[in-house]
């Protein structure tokens, strides 16, 4: 199996093991990482980036650690997943404070991580706009602030993201 196939299988199992489903649609959670990986694959990318796209929520949402990712997929994938993992915790403060901390973290990330983050933003924004228009107003403002720091991400995805969030 390729690293991308291994990442897809691993992420599918990790999210299923905790019973995670997509908010609003209740589909198996892997639908989201699959969409993110598919978006990454539409622009210049590496297999490491696509693997990280599949794995980007495993550390935040499942029992998987960065060490587990490193052991299974190596340092490059683990580094990208680490950049893509939110660093804020509930005790850091309200949502605005937490999102600011997470923006500061991803602002320092390399181009590959920021490209995956743009794909994640595109996928999540479309879903939230379709299923929760009231929350979308708050969410899209947060994403507009996030776009300000994703300066190293892929330009094509940046343009798509800006179009979606209404910038």
Regions flagged by a language model, labelled:
Residues 1-167:
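Active-site helical microenvironments for divalent-metal-assisted chemistry
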């Amino acid at each position: 199996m390729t690293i991308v196939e291994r990442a897809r299988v691993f992420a599918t199992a990790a999210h299923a093991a905790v019973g995670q489903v997509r908010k609003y649609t209740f589909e198996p959670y892997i639908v989201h990482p699959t969409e993110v990986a598919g978006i990454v694959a539409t622009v210049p990318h590496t297999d490491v980036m696509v693997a990280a796209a599949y794995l980007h929520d495993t550390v935040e949402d499942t029992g998987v650690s960065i060490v587990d990712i490193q052991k299974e997929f190596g340092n490059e994938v683990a580094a990208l997943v680490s950049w893509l993992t939110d660093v804020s915790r509930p005790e850091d403060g309200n949502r605005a404070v937490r999102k600011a901390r997470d923006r500061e973290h991803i602002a320092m990330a390399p181009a590959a991580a920021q490209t995956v983050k743009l794909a994640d933003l595109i996928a999540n924004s479309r879903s939230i706009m379709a299923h929760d228009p009231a929350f979308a107003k708050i969410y899209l403002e947060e994403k507009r602030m996030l776009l300000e720091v994703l300066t190293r991400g892929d330009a094509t995805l940046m343009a798509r993201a800006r179009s979606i969030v209404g910038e």
